[in-house]
């Protein structure tokens, strides 16, 4: 099954980090599910991750990413190092190279986008979004970030609601996780 047209957003603000996603699953031109969960807490709830792409591929990548984080002998959680290591493997490994997904990973200090082309991007702003409605959610979130009264969770929720109004592959059944 393929999560075609997913919208996932990550935001950091005031010591809180949020990853949120819509719940729509489409297959071709058909909506198969409206309440899918596309985000996870990893490493005992210290890291949030969300994905756009094939479901089985995303689960594999979540597992590989968590392995990379936990592989440090000193026990330090370094999502930047783990993201780079995963991106290297994803790009060069014959099996992983075929996986079709994008990931957002975040902890209390970082937000990163990881792609199968080997990209690891840390956004300039404390917000990033992926998927078919990603640009809509990102634009809305940037505008909402100017309102200092809104929390990271408020901004993510409002931004995804706007994306759902514009993108036919995004719905307003939002799942949100927060750390910090």
From Swiss-Prot:
Instruction: Give the principal location in a single coarse category.
Output: cytoplasm
Instruction: Extract the GO molecular function terms from the UniProt entry.
Output: metal ion binding; threonine-type endopeptidase activity
The catalytic residues are: 6
Subcellular location per the Swiss-Prot or TrEMBL entry: Cytoplasm
Q: What class of enzyme is it?
A: hydrolase
Cellular component terms (Gene Ontology): HslUV protease complex; proteasome core complex
Does the keyword section mention Nucleotide-binding?
no
Q: Which Pfam families match?
A: Proteasome
Gene Ontology terms describing biological process: proteolysis involved in protein catabolic process
Domain of life of the native organism: Bacteria
Question: How is activity regulated here?
Answer: Allosterically activated by HslU binding.
Q: What is its EC number?
A: 3.4.25.2
Could you list this entry's UniProt keywords, alphabetically sorted: Allosteric enzyme, Cytoplasm, Hydrolase, Metal-binding, Protease, Sodium, Threonine protease
Q: Where does Na(+) bind?
A: 164, 167, 170
Catalyses: ATP-dependent cleavage of peptide bonds with broad specificity
List the NCBIfam families hit by this protein, alphabetically. ATP_dep_HslV, PRK05456.1
Q: Which family does it belong to?
A: Belongs to the peptidase T1B family. HslV subfamily.
Xref: HAMAP family: HslV
Q: What does this protein do?
A: Protease subunit of a proteasome-like degradation complex believed to be a general protein degrading machinery.
Query: Subunit details for this protein?
Result: A double ring-shaped homohexamer of HslV is capped on each side by a ring-shaped HslU homohexamer. The assembly of the HslU/HslV complex is dependent on binding of ATP.
Name under which the protein is recorded: ATP-dependent protease subunit HslV
Annotated organism of origin: Borrelia duttonii (strain Ly)
């Amino acid at each position: 099954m393929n999560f075609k047209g997913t919208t996932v957003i990550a935001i950091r603000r005031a010591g809180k980090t949020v990853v949120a996603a819509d719940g729509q699953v489409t297959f071709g031109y058909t909506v198969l599910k409206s309440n899918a969960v596309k985000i996870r807490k990893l490493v005992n709830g210290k890291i949030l991750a969300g994905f756009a792409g094939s479901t089985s591929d995303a689960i594999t990548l979540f597992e590989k990413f968590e392995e990379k984080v936990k592989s440090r002998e000193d026990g330090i959680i370094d999502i930047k190092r783990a993201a780079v290591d995963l991106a290297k493997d994803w790009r060069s490994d014959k099996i992983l190279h075929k996986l079709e997904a994008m990931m957002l990973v975040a902890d209390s200090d970082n937000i990163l986008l990881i792609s199968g082309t080997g990209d690891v991007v840390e956004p300039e702003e404390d917000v990033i979004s992926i998927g078919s409605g990603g640009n809509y959610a990102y634009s809305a979130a940037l505008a909402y970030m100017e309102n200092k009264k809104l929390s990271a969770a408020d901004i993510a929720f409002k931004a995804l609601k706007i994306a759902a109004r514009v993108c036919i592959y995004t719905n307003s059944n939002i799942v949100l996780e927060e750390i910090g």
